[in-house]
Amino acid sequence: MVPTDHPKRLLALVSFAGILALLSFALWPVFLISLGQEWGLSNTDIGTVSGAYFMGYLVATPILVGLTDRIDARLVFLGGCAFGGVGCLGFGILADGFWSASLTWALVGAGLAGTYMPGLQILNARLDDAARVRSVPWYTACFGIGTGASFGVMGTVLAFADWQVAAYLGAGGSVLAALLVLFQVRACPPAPVPASQKKRHPLDLRPAFRKPVALGYIFAYGTHTYELFAFRTWSFALLVFLAGRADGGFGIGAVTTIVSLITVTGMLASLLGARICLAYGRHRVIALIGATTALVSLLVAFSLTGPVWLVVLGLWVYNGFIMLDSGALTTGTVEAGDRHDRGALLAVHSMIGFGGGALGGPVVGYVLDQAGGADMIGAWFYALLAMGAGSAIVFSIQRHFWRRMA
């Protein structure tokens, strides 16, 4: 099959490769309860292992994403798949406690740094301006499909096999993603630097800090990602806790299905939010989404003592509101950049974004420990408030730009 240049087919192909590369994403969130007990970890330790994934992403991002301004992003994507595959194999073979799990899981996170934004750069380099603006929300929304599919696969493995099988499946996803991009995406050299501008070192990220509007989206993305990945890390454990409280209970299979559906349907919310931003103004819409999402987190926290079905529905709605501004924030950063420095902007976008993601899991784990543990309703109340703080900060940042540009 010949590599495609058609915008829609290219978007579908790169998005599917990204979904395959994300197959390992839910390995730790799904198995953290059983492995935490087996390895004698506290909730703070569990959250820190989760955060190691995003720290790996954070450390690798300036190198891997910054390189996409100098070399074909397709090559960076292949390198990211190699990191992810080796990390999954290392986790399956070597992980037996806090440090070994953290180090190997960080390598898997570094793999994501080489596939997520470089995948977007594959599209940016091959699409015209109009197609790029239309494609970014779809591509970023597919992150939700990938994570939802990962929860489905890893939850099924939890029911029928063990965590090592899950790790090997994650490695297989990275291999398939690499093969797809290698053989189905044509090579494309990076854009030449304009003669009026000095050639920039790939690790020189200063262009991002010269664009205040881009920084507004970037820092808002950091607090958004803090909340999103705190939710992703702990939602499976929260639903397992709720399952034990339900009349008659419900099993791991039901929890897996619920988390997968919650995650996948978040993609629709991301696309909807991007469309609303185009119609009513990006800063204003994101600010209002942030305020509403913080309020929803508070309402869900107060609903924890109510019927389990109501809490599950509330979590579903909460995830949807978290995702409403996800694609819009990334699109804002892309639009604020130029072709020759977009890699630098996306590198900073990813670093600050996933730096926030690295904090989400540990912060919520610490809150759970301090409030009595993950088997206490009161602890989950404060955990949800800690998550919702991210959207409150998004509101504050974007309100500033909304007012300034009014």
Regions found by a protein language model. Give the residues of each.
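Flexible cytoplasmic inter-helical loops of multi-pass small-molecule transporters
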Residues: F183-D204
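C-terminal ends and interior cores of transmembrane alpha-helices
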Residues: A82-D96, T292-T305
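Conserved MFS/SLC helix-loop-helix module at the cytosolic interface between two early adjacent transmembrane helices
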Residues: V59-A95
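C-terminal transmembrane helical hairpin of 12-TM major facilitator-type secondary transporters
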Residues: H283-L329
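Extracytoplasmic gate region of multi-pass secondary transporters
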Residues: W28-P29, A214-V259
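Cytoplasmic helix-loop-helix junction between adjacent transmembrane helices
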Residues: T104-C142
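Multi-pass alpha-helical transporter architecture, strongest
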Residues: L179-Q184, A383-A406
